[in-house]
A protein has these predicted regions:
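Intracellular alpha-helical coupling/juxtamembrane segments of multi-pass membrane proteins
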Residues: 258-291, 295-301, 305-312
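ABC ATP-binding cassette signature C-motif
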Residues: 1-271, 315, 322-562
């Protein structure tokens, strides 16, 4: 997957099946070149993580051959990385530079030996010490080891790692992933395998990571649904489709164009998926001003969206979101709201007014109070000061991150259908299995017990549960986490055609840019800024307001010298 680089890794006829009738990978032949940047995309369950585990050497049960060129190292970021719970955060990060730590320790040990009689009275031992000291000095100079502490601080700051003395056993899932990523980047393996690297990173950390990987000398292979990440970093896209591995040269936007053309040649009648791809490609090709105009037009088209023919929408969209009852002019208004937990003030004097058909993206660092905002609106927690005024016509539908209302003992089909073959959706009865298929649950997947679902599958199921409740105001907490690009694209279109108001917590910049009419930004220091416009427009506005001097902003610097 490059034109003039050395092949460092090949897969020859690799196949993998989990059951006799479910082959995930089929006879894959691929060669990877040193320095290539490869993004892997495909539906959930298409074998992306399995492929990564095969390359990492963690999955041994497969057919075919995996061949590495000698002398190359491999590093792997799993979705749930293993960390030593007995260590502190910094001790785990330092594992990534253990060879440098060992070199410095040996250098200090040699210096101490110079003062011992058994060495300075023996010329041969002294010569050996001087020789070894010179070797170590060369290594220290080459790796800039004297500045190791500042590099560790830079890496931990860039990825928003928790305090360095924090015990690993007390870290959240997101914190563990950030610590594992920090350790891996410091290791600098020749082949860097990243499974959903942008999950649990805020926008500034993602921006830093993109710049780091653009300059990374080795090969980077990343499974991700973050399309801006794929656009900025990837030089190749590897699509996994029904077991086949299809390489495409270029970034995500290039793949979108090539894929659309290929589907156009293969299909006599345009499928829903092809039309969805074509509409996303149209958006990619839009000039910034045209995108802005599209967002503003939505705010003036409530009646048009509300009165669109439901059957036409269902035929057009992969994910159809029923509009719910008609919204009045008042949706939700925050007036002087404040909330704190002990000494930690999340926000103070929060004010905003949601428009009837706006799509509001909620952004900010982890722990800033975004989920708390939703819980306050839902009445699950109480404000310390101020009020949330909810309009009389509002019917809320809430998708949270915990998915607590999913019964682990029931199947996916039982949870959605409630034992009925037909479910009510948008004043129409539709087949429950057909509804589930829109969220990428095929026949066998619909019979899975909910307790056995992956994170992405649970996310899709909860989304399907909430959207069929026919709310006219949707509160979606990280709906884009752990779902594949196809489902993301379908969700974007469903929201774009939804006549009501949606408030969406997400770190997915492409998603935010494509659908949002407003941004509610948690900017630090308990400040929350409500902005009319897309994510990109908000970023421009933020730069004008805060400039490069804004102290929370991570500016890119290399972790280690080459």
């Amino acid at each position: 997957m490059a034109d003039d680089k050395k092949i460092i890794f090949s897969m020859v006829g690799v196949s993998k099946a989990f059951q006799a009738n479910k082959q995930v990978l089929k006879d894959i032949y691929l060669s990877f070149f040193y320095g290539a940047k490869i993004g892997i995309i495909g539906l959930n369950g298409s074998g992306k993580s399995t492929l990564m585990k095969i390359i990492a050497g963690l999955e041994k049960s497969y057919q075919g051959e995996v061949v590495f060129s000698p002398g190359y190292s491999v590093g792997y970021l799993a979705q749930e990385p293993h960390l030593d719970d007995e260590k502190t955060m910094k001790e785990v990060v330092m594992e990534g530079v253990q060879s440098i730590v060992d070199t410095l320790a040996e250098y200090e040990e040699i210096n101490n030996k110079f003062g011992l009689p058994e060495y300075y009275e023996d010329s041969e031992k002294m010569d050996a010490l001087f020789a070894r000291q010179a070797e170590l000095q060369d290594i220290i100079d080459a790796t800039d080891a004297w500045n190791l502490d500042s590099k560790l601080e830079r890496a931990m700051d860039a990825l928003r790692c928790p305090p360095e003395d924090q015990p690993v056993k007390n870290l959240s899932g997101g914190e563990r992933r950030r610590v594992a990523l920090c350790r891996l980047l410091l290791q600098k393996p020749d082949i860097l395998l990243l499974d959903e690297p942008t999950n649990h990173l805020d926008a500034e950390s993602i921006d830093w990571l993109e710049q780091h990987l653009q300059q990374y000398e080795g090969t980077v292979i990343a499974v991700t649904h973050d399309r801006y990440f794929l656009d900025h970093v990837a030089g190749w896209i590897l699509e996994l489709d029904r077991g086949e591995g299809i390489p495409w040269k270029g970034n995500y936007s290039s793949w979108l164009e090539q894929k659309t053309k290929r589907m156009e040649m293969e299909e006599k009648v345009a499928s829903k998926r092809r039309k969805t791809l074509e509409r996303e490609l149209d958006w990619v090709r839009m000039a910034p001003k045209a995108r802005q105009a599209k967002g503003k037009a939505r705010l003036n088209s409530y009646d048009k969206l509300l009165n669109e023919d439901v059957k036409e929408k269902e035929e057009k969209l992969e994910i159809f979101i029923p509009n719910g009852p008609r919204l009045g002019n008042k949706v939700i208004e925050a007036k002087g709201v404040a909330k704190a937990y002990g000494d930690k003030l999340l926000f103070d004097n929060l004010n905003f007014m949601l428009p009837p058909n706006g799509i509001v993206g909620v952004i900010g660092p982890n722990g800033a109070g975004k989920t708390t905002l939703f819980r306050l609106i839902m009445g699950l927690e109480t404000v310390d000061k101020g009020t949330f005024e909810v309009g009389e016509t509002v019917k809320l539908a809430y998708v949270d991150q915990q998915h607590k209302d999913i019964d682990p003992a029931k199947s996916v089909y039982q949870v959605i259908s409630g034992g009925n073959e037909l479910i009510r959706l948008g004043n129409r009865d539709i087949n429950a299995r057909a509804y589930l298929s829109r969220f990428n649950f095929s026949g066998a997947d619909q019979e899975k017990l909910c307790g056995m679902l992956s994170g992405g599958e649970r996310n899709r199921l909860h989304l399907a549960m909430a959207l069929k409740e026919e709310g006219n105001v949707l509160l979606l907490d990280e709906p884009t986490n752990d779902i594949d690009v196809n489902t993301l694209r379908a969700l974007e279109e469903g929201l774009d055609d939804f006549a009501g108001c949606a408030v969406v917590i997400s770190h997915d910049r492409w998603f935010l840019d494509r659908i949002c009419t407003h941004i509610l930004a948690f900017e630090g220091n308990s400040e929350v800024f409500f902005f009319e416009g897309s994510y990109s427009e908000y970023e421009e506005n933020k730069m004008k307001r805060l400039g490069n001097e804004e102290p929370k902003r991570v500016r890119y610097r290399k972790l280690m010298e080459d």
